Curated annotation (Swiss-Prot):
Gene3D superfamilies assigned to the protein according to its UniProt record, in alphabetical order: RNAP, epsilon subunit-like (3.10.20.730)
Stretches that traverse the bilayer: none
Protein name: DNA-directed RNA polymerase subunit epsilon
Entry keyword annotation includes Transferase: yes
A Pfam family matched in the record: RpoY
One example GO MF annotation: DNA binding
Keyword entries, A-Z: DNA-directed RNA polymerase, Nucleotidyltransferase, Transcription, Transferase
Catalytic activity: RNA(n) + a ribonucleoside 5'-triphosphate = RNA(n+1) + diphosphate
Gene this protein is translated from: rpoY
Source organism phylogeny: Bacteria, Bacillati, Bacillota, Bacilli, Bacillales
Annotated GO biological process: DNA-templated transcription
EC number of this enzyme: 2.7.7.6
Function in brief: A non-essential component of RNA polymerase (RNAP).
HAMAP family in alphabetical order: RNApol_bact_RpoY
Length: 69
């Protein structure tokens, strides 16, 4: 399944909505995704599963690229 991860680039700073980035990653569960990203030092705010019509909508974005770790 593909997940959309909302994160802050620096884990040691207070989260600010305007600085939130997102990425897409494939995993079997939210825990699996968080485990794959733990070495990136991101401040992960939210992990959202993406499927069905929502996935098709996200694929239309020019920024849609599934991160492979």
């Amino acid at each position: 399944m593909i997940y959309k991860v909302f994160y802050q680039e620096k884990a040691d700073e207070v989260p600010v909505r305007e600085k939130t980035d997102s990425l897409y990653i494939e995993g079997v569960s939210e825990r699996d995704v968080r485990t794959k990203l733990k070495d990136q030092k991101y401040n992960i705010e939210f992990v959202q599963p993406v499927d069905g019509a929502f996935l098709e909508y996200e694929k239309q974005s020019e920024n849609f690229k599934v991160l492979e770790l």
